[in-house]
A protein has these predicted regions:
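Active-site or pore-adjacent capping/gating segments
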Residues: 350, 368-369, 373, 386-395, ...
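Short, solvent-exposed aromatic-acidic interface loops
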Residues: 231, 368-384, 567-570
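Glycine-rich phosphate/diphosphate-binding loops and the adjacent beta-loop-alpha structural elements
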Residues: 406-427
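Gram-negative bacterial Sec-dependent N-terminal signal peptides
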Residues: 16-18
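Acidic, metal/ion-coordinating pockets
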Residues: 31-32, 36-374, 433-440, 451, ...
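Bacterial N-terminal signal peptides that target proteins for export
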Residues: 3-14
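C-terminal motif of bacterial Sec signal peptides marking the signal peptidase cleavage site
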Residues: 23-26
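Feature captures C-terminal
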Residues: 48-53, 63, 71-78, 82, ...
Length: 689
């Protein structure tokens, strides 16, 4: 059931979610022009000042509750239900607020997959995440790359739009469905059919703020705030199967330079860019993934809300490369002088930009001397967490329970613990079963439908999607015993579909060289602590687990020259030999920028999700064993003749037993706390063993 919009005059209409509907003193959440104040703007004295707090959520990924559907357990370190408490606190602190979401909102948990794929929401139903956001009275939002993961028809429906794109009926023939009660803006994704933006590129919100005149009087005055949204142009690769031929993207700078002058001409006092991307100051490209550094240089932007990178900004102690670029002030929270915030991910932080405003007689401008930026965590200084807003869980109780019931569906059993705690150093325990399922599926299809490729060997590749980025609980961990759908979702995190590509032996080598970017270059002659794992994402650390394929990774060599002794069936791999590799749509279409993988090598684009293929494979096999499904190591680190280096990496605390069970040697835990504040320990690996 769709919740009615909350208003300042009709609070009882949403009594069930009353504690989410915090009253704004001056700034409402409705997508309407606020009631004109008693004193019109033109009469506000020159020098009148005000404070407007921009509140940001980003990369919520449908973590509505503090709950892990993979482990079927509470996880107090995340969840919108706790951010909702921070929102309430900020609204009490500041008389004027604007609550905005940065995107990557509708995908990311078993709840989102249940509502999109298992029991799709009806046209008259509002997604669980949008239901609670409506109740929280968001003022606006952007669109992230993951919004496109389920396809354009679904996105059109759940956002309450009627996209005019190929594959959908004409807008007049589409039914406008339930969606968010706040405007969503996106300026750089264009319909190929109409050459018009897929979403509204920007909107201008008129809000009444409480202000102070130069003589100290309190007055009400309208402020016009323009919001404009951007998403990574790389969606055209990542979700090519849904988007190719239907939409295209423009660069962030180009879109901003087109629309911001329009926004100003239409009376926007302020312009807030909602950019779902991080910071990258390399040579500008209209297709660059993280273009927010360049966006900040476009004239006319007063503040930026950024995301996508799953990081915290500002953070004075951050060692993250993008926050230590020229022009980036990680203490004050500015990018090339523009106040900027990134509020982490999964509901771990609330971004707050407190804008100091000054009225010059015609318009409101930002007083940077009165502007501050912070990302407020849901974790308190004493390591406890802020209380959850109970109305959030009450609002989606039915959806939550239905998801739990679904993921408890039994599918098989395992005799070993399938985890990714030591995937970075060679444990295939949570990878091999995925590779087996993909290979079995592709082999069957090729034999039945692609006789021209039937003689080619089929390999399979996947990555440890959960490799500790989010801390000690961010690992795949499936206990021995009965297997259910939630375990399969833990093994395969994303709603990808199976793709098969035809590649050469040389392509396989290049594929592995790219995956080996996961590691830093180690100098074995230096008796210093040297971090093994780089910032290269774990979800791009592709691994083969075939008895026919073997290779070594030499981390003493530079990127691009690390793969040694690459063999197929015991002989050096032939660069010209042809192989079929089972993978996913993201990788086959260019995700991760692997050489040669740009969509052109795809021979089979399956409609079936990798996770569903995995579930079917486990059901067919019934009993999964370490000997058959979790012990095939295709790769090892090159053994060093000697080394005095202290090569270290992070993983969850007290997991050495898992390393031993996987047959890994030379690993010790050297510190119970790695100092990151993410519940990780420091381990050391001896590369001479």
């Amino acid at each position: 059931m769709r919740l009615p919009p909350l208003s300042r005059r009709h609070v009882p209409a949403a009594a069930a979610l009353a504690s989410l509907a915090f009253i704004l003193a001056g700034c409402g959440g409705d997508d309407v022009t606020a009631t004109p104040p008693s004193q019109p703007e033109a009469q506000a004295p020159v020098g009148t000042t005000a404070t407007l707090a921009l509140l940001e959520t980003t990369d919520l990924h449908t973590n509505v509750l503090s709950y892990d559907y993979f482990k079927l357990a509470a996880d107090n370190s995340l969840g919108f239900e706790r951010v909702s408490t921070l929102i309430a606190q900020a609204r009490k602190q500041y008389p004027n607020t604007l609550l905005l979401d940065n995107g990557d909102t509708i995908q990311g948990t078993a709840l989102s997959d249940y509502q999109a794929l298992v029991k799709p929401v009806g046209c008259d139903q509002t997604l669980a995440i949008y239901k609670v956001m409506n109740a929280a009275k968001f003022d606006g939002g952007g669109i992230g790359n993951h919004e496109f993961n389920y396809g354009l028809p679904y996105l059109s429906q759940v956002t309450g739009n009627t996209f005019e794109v190929d594959g959908l009926p004409a807008p007049a023939q589409q039914k406008k469905c339930a969606g968010p009660n706040f405007p969503q803006v996106l300026a750089n994704v264009i319909s190929a059919k109409t050459n018009a933006p897929l979403f509204t590129p920007y909107t201008i919100l008129t809000r009444t703020v409480t202000a102070t005149t130069p003589d100290g009087k309190t007055v009400s005055a309208p402020v016009k705030i323009g919001i404009i949204g951007f998403t990574p142009p790389a969606i055209m690769n990542w979700d090519k199967r849904w988007l190719d031929g239907k939409v295209y993207t423009t660069g962030l700078k180009e879109a901003a330079e087109k629309y911001i002058p329009e926004m100003r001409a239409k009376g926007a006092d302020l312009v807030v860019a909602i950019s779902h991307g991080g910071l990258d100051n390399s040579a500008y490209s209209p297709t660059m993934e993280n273009g927010s550094w360049w966006l900040s240089k476009v004239s006319g932007i007063d503040a930026m809300l950024i995301g996508h990178s799953h990081q915290v900004f500002p953070d004075a102690n951050s060692t993250v490369a993008q926050f230590n670029l020229p022009g980036v002030d990680k203490v004050k929270g500015t990018v090339n002088g523009v106040p900027t915030v990134m509020a982490n991910y999964w509901g771990k932080h609330l971004g707050v930009i407190k804008l100091g405003l000054k009225f010059d007689g015609k318009t409101w401008t930002v007083d940077k001397s009165q502007t501050t930026v912070e990302a407020r965590p849901i974790q308190n200084a004493d390591k406890s967490y802020v209380a959850a807003d109970p109305s959030v869980s009450a609002a989606i109780a039915a959806e939550h329970q239905a998801t739990i019931d679904y993921v408890k569906t039994p599918i098989g059993s395992t005799d070993y613990r399938m985890n990714s705690y030591f995937a970075d150093v060679g444990d295939p325990g949570a990878i091999q079963i995925v590779n087996e399922a993909q290979a079995d599926y592709v082999k069957t299809y090729v034999q039945a439908n692609l006789p021209q490729y039937a003689s080619l060997p089929v390999l399979s590749v996947s990555a440890p999607f959960k490799s500790g980025f989010g801390g000690g609980t961010d690992y795949t961990d499936v206990a021995p015993g009965a297997l259910a759908i939630n375990n399969a979702a833990d093994l395969y995190l994303y709603p990808n579909t199976v793709y098969a590509v035809k590649v050469s032996g040389a392509d396989v080598k290049n594929w592995l060289e790219t995956a080996a970017k996961r590691f830093n270059t180690i100098d074995p002659t230096k008796a210093t602590v040297q971090p093994l794992v780089s910032t290269f994402p774990g979800y791009n650390f592709d691994m083969f687990t075939s008895a026919d394929l073997a290779y070594e990774i030499d981390v003493t060599q530079p990127v691009g020259s690390r793969i040694r002794n690459l063999t197929y069936k015991g002989a050096p791999i032939d660069p010209n030999a042809q192989f079929i590799v089972a993978t996913n749509n993201y990788r086959a279409s260019g995700g991760g920028n692997f050489p040669g993988l740009d969509g052109s090598k795809t021979i089979f684009a399956s409609p079936d999700a990798n996770r569903d293929v995995l579930i079917a494979f486990i059901k067919k096999r019934g009993a999964i064993t370490r000997a058959a499904d979790g012990a095939q190591r295709s790769w090892r680190f090159t053994k060093l003749a000697s080394s005095v280096a202290h090569v270290q990496f992070a993983s969850a605390p007290n997991r050495l037993g898992d390393a031993a069970a996987a047959g890994l040697t030379g690993i010790t835990q050297v510190a119970a706390d790695d100092g990151s504040g993410k519940n990780l320990s420091t381990y050391e690996i001896d590369l001479t063993q």
